[in-house]
Amino acid sequence: MYKRQEVVGTDYNKELVATLNAGKTTFKEDGLDELFNDAVKAGIKFTTEYQKTDMYIVSVPTPYDKFSKKVDACYVVVAIKEVMKICPKGATVVVESTVSPGTMDNFVRPVVEENGFKIGEDLHLVHAPERIIPGNMVYELLHNNRTIGADSKEIGEKVKQYYVSFCQGEIVVTDIRSAEMTKVVENTFRAVNIAFANELARICRHDNMDIYEIIKICNMHPRVNLSLIHISEPTRLALIS
């Protein structure tokens, strides 16, 4: 099922790189240590220097700016600039970071072209948004469905073959803007449902109603599927449908 790939992890944090090269992880997740140990035995390496390869996967933070109410893609742009300093002609850059729709067109493409690269020939751009949640990262990495957005079906299918080597979920190939939008829609849908759950819980508490009983009854409707996925305290509920 798993096709072996040669992998090199890159990070500017020298202490982190040293820790990983020593065979140690820096946080705990179910199944992570076992997976990491297997990767170490298979030859994974970590460095602060970008390497020459045919494919780069960029997974960096995209913080939310509460003042502009926009996602800041500066770390993505910086990472791609570093890649362009070393990558061979025809390399593919896959951005896994969550970005706003239009980020690849409005921020990434201009930078690539300004550096003299012809997109689709010198460098291929792909967006394959991650779909994992802390606490269940390993399972979701292996089993969640994935979306790959590319400028051409050929490149999309090429990248898909890399993901098939570890992802057991369905992998859909589409265009980049659609891939950007699907991740934002997924996150927004979840956020809206959490907000709805909190409001529903507030109303139920105010009127001394049992929210669990209400959800149970509502779920008897063929087009309703409400699920309590997390209760951190009596005043907060997380709900998805």
Residue spans of the language-model regions?
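Conserved N-terminal Rossmann-fold NAD(P) cofactor-binding segment
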Residues: E6, T10-M55, S59-K70, V111-N115
